[in-house]
Amino acid sequence: MRILLVNDDGIHSPGLRALAVALQGEGHCVTVVAPDRERSAVGHGVTTRDPLFVQEQDWEGIPAYSCSGTPADCTQLGLEALAKGPVDLVISGPNRG
């Protein structure tokens, strides 16, 4: 299954990496796109006026990207540009909060 994994705690959240590794270990094709910092409590906010910056992360075989935007921005970028091909499932989490 092709999975897009996002969160609101940021790309450096240990739970995010653990889930990505576990999903890949089960044979899934995982792409991670997460905010470059903690972005809890922004709801469904999207960035409309500022440019978004994306940086590829070194996650040892798992495509992973940090984004300067909100979790919703990360989801949209993942679905429209960063995931290689169509996505079967989007998982948002895990969440420390």
Model-predicted segments: where are they?
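Short glycine-rich anion-binding loops that position phosphate/pyrophosphate groups of nucleotides
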Residues: 9, 38, 70-71, 95-97
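Short, Asp-centered acidic motifs that coordinate Mg2+ and/or phosphate
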Residues: 89
